[in-house]
């Protein structure tokens, strides 16, 4: 059974009660407009928060606390949907009934402490943690080129959607990481807490009402602004002349990516027809791209198409020897 309810202004819970699993899961996501000036900072915040809190000041203490909760796990979430950047935490934990004692409530307390009571130094994030996570983020951004398939698609999006928020990568840009300071990151963290819409998700054996009661208690100190930053995605419009970009690299297999505007996004009357078109064109092993271009003509190692339902874009990816 699924229920949605608003716990606090701009904070919504989706709870799915089920007896199917031995573990429960929970996530908290902050929705931010995808902007280059804050994308890298938003991506950095969850990692810094997960380095230490007032009660668990370092990774060893955090690991010990998770072990006490029957080997529960917690991690960071950084996603991009259309022109919305979503960051936060997720957690998996054993059900109370199987543990023989409460696990859900202390797990929520732990996540609440990580989120709302981070380890600080002189009114800002601990510099050691910020610098360490900056290096990790910079390495993650720089390593995108190692996955040529994903890199080619990313470069296509940057070219096709140049000037639009959708061109901003999920983790931000490499050159925006180094200037981040502990003070600036903490100020952005406070802004994210107060001005973002928040989506909570729970799946497990507890009722939505029980989950809501615990979360209202845990999040009672969450600051809430009078208004929240609007999030949404502007449909991609046709760009006129065809644009071609070529990057030369020493690789054994070239990557060819093509982008098309569809003029249609999820929720529109024509969207189901677009899904069927994508399936026929390149969305599976029975599609034309697979059966004709790959199998019959042997023109490429792989060829597929996908729909970005929030932006109104179709992307074709292929590997060419």
Give the residues covered by each predicted segment.
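M16 family metallopeptidases and their MPP-like homologs
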Residues: 14-16, 22-42, 59-113, 149-172, ...
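Acidic/histidine-enriched alpha-helical segments
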Residues: 63, 117-141, 229-237
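An alpha-helix initiation/capping motif
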Residues: 128-131, 135, 150, 154, ...
């Amino acid at each position: 059974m699924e229920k949605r309810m608003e716990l606090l202004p701009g904070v919504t819970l989706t709870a799915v009660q089920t007896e199917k699993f031995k573990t429960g899961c929970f996530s908290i996501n902050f929705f931010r407009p995808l902007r280059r000036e804050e994308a890298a900072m938003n991506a950095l915040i969850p990692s810094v928060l997960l380095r230490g809190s007032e009660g668990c000041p370092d990774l060893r203490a955090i690991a010990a606390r998770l072990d006490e909760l029957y080997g529960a796990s917690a991690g960071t979430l950084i996603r991009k949907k259309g022109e919305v950047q979503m960051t936060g935490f997720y957690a998996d934990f054993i059900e109370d009934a199987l543990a023989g004692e409460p696990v859900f409530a202390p797990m929520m307390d732990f996540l609440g402490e990580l989120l709302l009571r981070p380890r600080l130094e002189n009114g800002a994030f601990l510099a050691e943690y910020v610098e360490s996570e900056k290096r990790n983020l910079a390495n993650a951004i720089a390593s995108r080129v190692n996955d040529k398939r994903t890199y080619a698609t990313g470069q296509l999006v940057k070219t096709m959607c140049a000037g639009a928020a959708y061109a901003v990568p999920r983790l931000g840009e490499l050159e925006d990481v180094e200037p981040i300071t502990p003070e600036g990151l903490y100020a952005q963290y406070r802004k994210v807490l107060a001005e973002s819409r928040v989506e909570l998700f729970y799946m497990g054996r507890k009722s939505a009402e029980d989950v809501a009661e615990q979360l209202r208690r845990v999040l009672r100190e969450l600051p809430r602004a009078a208004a929240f930053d609007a999030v949404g995605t502007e449909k991609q419009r046709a760009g006129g002349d065809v644009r071609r970009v070529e990057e030369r690299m020493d690789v054994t297999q070239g990557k060819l990516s093509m982008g098309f505007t569809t003029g249609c996004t999820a929720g529109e009357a024509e969207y189901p027809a677009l899904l069927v078109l994508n399936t026929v064109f390149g969305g599976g092993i029975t599609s034309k791209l697979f059966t004709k271009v790959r199998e019959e003509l042997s023109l490429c190692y792989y060829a597929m198409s996908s729909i970005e339902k929030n932006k109104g874009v179709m992307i074709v990816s292929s590997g060419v020897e």
